Amino acid sequence: MPLRATLADLEPILAFQERAYHENRAIKGVEPLPLSVDYTGLFDTMEFWIEGPRDNPEGVVILDPTHEPPGDALFIWSIATAPDQRGKGLGNKLLDFVERRARALNRRAVTLVTNSRLPERIDWYLRHDFVIMRHETLTYRIIVHMRKNIASD
């Protein structure tokens, strides 16, 4: 199970994110959103989780419980695996963790956005029962809003 990270884990998280999103930068031709912000302030409102050694994570999950209306969904701000861990089931494990965390927070769904230029990522989420809610055009990118319901009425 991932460990809750603190601001003391910032350097390894930043190094991890740079490695994990390096390929996306080349594909998209723009800076990935998770690499374009100052993480220091994010620790005040978001949950950071590390899988693997704290000083050299194999996976990182960043959740924003304040993004959606209370009680509705838990927003995945970032979910990533180290390049050498891809294809080993770690992404599935991290997504399972996110769903458990959403249930623990009494959320009905999990939501996220991804770039339209990453069809293999979109397909992966679709295989995990996410649905596409809408496309949004931003400067230099089109993002895909996705949602997975985890609770029934």
Predicted regions and their residues:
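Acetyl-CoA-dependent GNAT
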Residues: 7-84, 95-97, 101, 136-139, ...
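Conserved active-site tyrosine of GNAT-family acetyltransferases
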Residues: 125, 130
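Active-site acidic-Proline motif in GNAT/NAT acetyltransferases
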Residues: 81-84, 88, 116-117
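Residue-level marker of the N-terminal boundary of ABC ATPase nucleotide-binding domains
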Residues: 73, 122-124
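Conserved GNAT acetyl-CoA-binding A-motif
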Residues: 102-114
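Extreme N-terminal starter segment of soluble prokaryotic enzymes
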Residues: 1-2
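Conserved beta-strand-loop-alpha-helix junction that forms the acyl-donor binding cleft
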Residues: 112-121, 138-142
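Residues forming the Rossmann-fold NAD(P)(H) cofactor-binding site
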Residues: 92
